[in-house]
């Protein structure tokens, strides 16, 4: 899975690109002048996530399938925890928790193992977890929130 940026990304967008790709055990690449076909070639037959900007900050995630078809997009503001500075990403695929349309879209896109909300406490301490709520998506590692996307909109295509 490839995570990439808009054409001229800000430092914050590049940071989110790196964090998200490490968290989901994917690859990160700065887009530059590449068009969609070139990005799909770099994705090597896998899905693609493009991080868009709003006023110089990361503000949208667009999720594309292997053929380059836009499946859904999220608008958001981001937040980072101080815990992130000392966190080591294990490269293990995270688990997915949450209910609703966004959680279902994530399940179909990522194919991550789904965990019921009442079973989160039973996961091993080193687990990574994406918790999809009504208003946010929390990316957690070792039981702590590492970064969060505060949702502003969701659109399915």
From Swiss-Prot:
- Which SUPFAM superfamilies has this protein been placed in? Class II aaRS ABD-related (SSF52954)
> Which GO terms fall under biological process for this protein?
rRNA processing
- In the record, what terms sit under GO molecular function? rRNA binding
What Gene3D superfamilies does UniProt report for this protein, alphabetically? Answer: Probable brix-domain ribosomal biogenesis protein
List the keywords (alphabetical): Ribosome biogenesis
Brix domain location? 1-157
Instruction: Using the record for this protein, list the coiled-coil segments as residue ranges, or answer none.
Output: none
Annotated HAMAP family? BriX
What this chain does, per the entry, is described as: Probably involved in the biogenesis of the ribosome.
**What is the protein name stated in its UniProt record?**
Probable Brix domain-containing ribosomal biogenesis protein
Organism for this UniProt entry: Methanosarcina barkeri (strain Fusaro / DSM 804)
């Amino acid at each position: 899975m490839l995570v990439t940026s808009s054409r001229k990304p800000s430092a914050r967008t590049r940071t989110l690109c790196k964090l998200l790709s490490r968290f989901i055990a994917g690859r990160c690449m700065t887009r530059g002048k590449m068009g969609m076909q070139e990005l799909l070639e770099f994705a090597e037959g896998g899905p693609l996530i493009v991080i868009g900007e709003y006023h110089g900050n990361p503000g949208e995630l667009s999720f594309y399938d292997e053929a380059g078809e836009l499946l859904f997009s999220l608008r958001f503001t981001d937040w980072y925890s101080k815990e992130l500075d000392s966190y080591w990403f294990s490269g293990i695929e995270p688990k997915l928790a949450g209910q609703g349309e966004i959680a279902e879209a994530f399940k179909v896109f990522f194919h991550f193992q789904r965990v019921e909300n009442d079973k989160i406490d039973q996961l091993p301490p080193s687990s990574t977890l994406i918790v999809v709520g009504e208003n946010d998506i929390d990316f957690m590692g070792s039981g702590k929130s590492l970064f969060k996307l505060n949702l502003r909109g969701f659109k399915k295509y």
